[in-house]
Amino acid sequence: MAKMMQREITKTTVNVAKMVMVDGEVQVEQLPSETFVGNLSMEQAQWRMKRKYKGEPVQVVSVEPNTEVYELPVEKFLEVATVRVEKEDSEEQVAE
């Protein structure tokens, strides 16, 4: 049996709506859901949606975080992963 690597990942599905004028009345138009890696708050999701739909009146309706455990055989991980190179102290100081 192959050795497996496991990682718990949280993704957040953001449901968003847009306000539109139809015959002089404001109506809500549901937009496609967006999924982001991480556990986003309503405020974080609203900020991201405002950036995506610049200038449009959008409102986040709900955020739905979902955490799942993913696994991958170690051999496959080694095929696709890259070796992390540690930065030297002088490089880190310049970056700051």
Swiss-Prot record:
GO molecular function annotation: DNA binding
Residue range(s) of DNA binding per entry: 1-19
One Pfam family this sequence matches: p6
Stored InterPro entries: Histone-like_p6
Keyword Transcription: yes
Subunit structure: Homodimer. Homomultimer. Binds to double-stranded DNA giving rise to multimeric nucleoprotein complexes. Binding specificity for the viral DNA is based on supercoiling, the viral genome having a negative superhelicity lower than that of plasmid DNA. Interacts with the DNA replication protein p17; this interaction optimizes the binding of protein p6 at the viral DNA ends, thus favoring the initiation of replication.
Protein family according to the UniProt entry: Belongs to the phi29likevirus histone-like protein p6 family.
Name under which the protein is recorded: Histone-like protein p6
Organism: Bacillus phage PZA (Bacteriophage PZA)
GN (gene name): 6
